[in-house]
């Protein structure tokens, strides 16, 4: 049986939620459900795109929101040490194989300035979904 984007997003969320939840100090959310005013170290998982073939293929987005650290004089800077930890964590996580899914890193993990309080670490995973239905 084929699955839609929201179902695939939820499957990926269910696959990684426990490990990511233990790793981050904030919460793990589906796309569009992270509290707007959160400045915690959160993770958001979202469906990007998919091809509906015998083996469904596509991409999912995993974003980590990393609070900036105080550099003194009211200046906040990117938390490089924590971003490196997240990158290493994700590299181990993407090797996960389930009965239904295979995951591959689509592109180099990168970070950019979300705002003056947090940095966004972006991971794009490619998936292949195998179904015997």
Residues covered by each model-derived region:
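A short, hydrophobic beta-strand-centered structural micro-motif
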Residues: 38-47
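Charged, amphipathic alpha-helical segments and their flanking helix caps
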Residues: 1-25, 46-133
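Short acidic low-complexity segments
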Residues: 28-39
């Amino acid at each position: 049986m084929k699955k839609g984007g929201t179902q695939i997003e939820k499957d990926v969320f269910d696959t990684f939620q426990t490990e990511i939840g233990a790793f981050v100090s904030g919460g793990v959310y589906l796309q569009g459900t992270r509290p707007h005013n959160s400045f915690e170290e959160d993770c958001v998982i979202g469906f990007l795109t998919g091809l509906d073939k015998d083996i469904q293929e596509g991409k999912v987005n995993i974003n980590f929101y990393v609070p900036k650290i105080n550099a003194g004089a009211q200046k906040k800077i990117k938390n490089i040490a924590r971003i490196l930890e997240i990158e290493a964590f994700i590299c181990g996580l993407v090797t996960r194989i389930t009965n239904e899914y295979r995951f591959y890193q689509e592109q180099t993990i990168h970070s950019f300035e979300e705002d003056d309080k947090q940095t966004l670490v972006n991971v794009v995973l490619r998936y292949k979904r195998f179904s015997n239905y």
